[in-house]
Curated annotation (Swiss-Prot):
It comes from Mus musculus. The gene is Krt85. Residues 287-430 are annotated as: Coil 2. Residues 123-434 form the IF rod domain. Residues 1-123 are annotated as: Head. The keyword Transmembrane does not apply. Residues 431-507 are annotated as: Tail. This is Keratin, type II cuticular Hb5.
Amino acid sequence: MSCRSYRISPGCGVTRNFSSCSAVAPKTGNRCCISAAPFRGVSCYRGLTGFSSRSLCNPSPCGPRMAVGGFRSGSCGRSFGYRSGGVCGPSPPCITTVSVNESLLTPLNLEIDPNAQCVKYEEKEQIKCLNSKFAAFIDKVRFLEQQNKLLETKWQFYQNRKCCESNLEPLFGGYIEALRREAECVEADSGRLAAELNHVQEAMEGYKKKYEEEVALRATAENEFVVLKKDVDCAYLRKSDLEANVEALVEESSFLKRLYEEEVCVLQAHISDTSVIVKMDNSRDLNMDCVVAEIKAQYDDVASRSRAEAESWYRTKCEEMKATVIRHGETLRRTKEEINELNRMIQRLTAEIENAKCQRAKLEAAVAEAEQQGEAALADARCKLAELEGALQKAKQDMACLLKEYQEVMNSKLALDIEIATYRRLLEGEEQRLCEGVGSVNVCVSSSRGGVTCGGLTYGTTPGRQIVSGPSVTGGSITVMAPDSCSPCQPRASSFTCGSSRSVRFA
């Protein structure tokens, strides 16, 4: 491997190095030789020359070759490019004619600027910074594209959600109508229950009036019972008096009978003990026995009549009293039965009143619960409607914010697109200027894949293309493309390593 280095100055106070290198890879395949010699002369230099050559040779018996050369000179500049390469392979190398350019033997007056390296380093740093910014802009564009896709997805989602919410409005309308119908049914039930309650209250008032009437009748019956009891007591007292009178009369009659018998006995004894001869001068003969018998008969008749009258009167009174007692007992029994019936009716009415009160309380509780449920349902429906309206308003606000953000993102994207287009135009202009300022570029394409990076010069690849880029003599970059490419290599100071273990060193 051999290296040669030359220095040229592309402008006032600026120098740039160009090198020549060759690399040979032992891989069998196509041969790739690249030789480039860019030069740009400026009016402020005298006798400024530049030379650069680079060849990459593969020991393959045959392979495609491509050479590109370019030259651009100013008022007092010149350049010269030289490249030679041979086909390498297992056969002996061919001997080629060597030509010598005598102008190369003359000493060069390069007028090297000591600040060229610093300026070159600054240019490299600026290019790196611009590349970093460009990569950041590319990442930002990709991120904004992702955000754009996300916002579009959200937009579609919110549009579909809006449609769903608009479809929910008739559902809520139907739900509200159903609640309204339920409220109307509850109101109708409330009216019906109120009518039933009024009917029950009227029936209860009727039962109450009947109860009051029955209570009044009971009080009247009790008063009559008291009066009858007084009459019965009076009759019982009279009966007792009459019984006492009867006993007294019986005792008196027995006493009189005993008295009469005693008197008769005394008279008989007196008559028997006294023998009186009475001679009366009368024309009639008085028979005392007949008189006594007659008086006795009269007395017995009067006593029997009195006894019969007393007994008949007593029997009559007893019968009357018994009839009165039976009548009053029957009346009392009927009154008791009526009182019992009234008590049973009162109990039944009391139970019915209690049931009516319980039913009324239940109906009032049901009506109150139905009203509360209706009010709660209406309040819930109103709350849900308010929440849905708030959610709809919030969704609209979010949609407006998202639209605003989307507009800002689109504006940022447009600005970035403009910046990218500006950078693209700048890059295209630099490439055009590089194409105008290149002296000679020779490119040999092989089937191997790789990349070369040297200082500000980058040799990169993509599938099917070969790219060589680097700073131009005008301060830009140069890019060369070929139909085939090799895998990229990472830069290491002033050397690089290819994926096929091939290295190129620039002095």
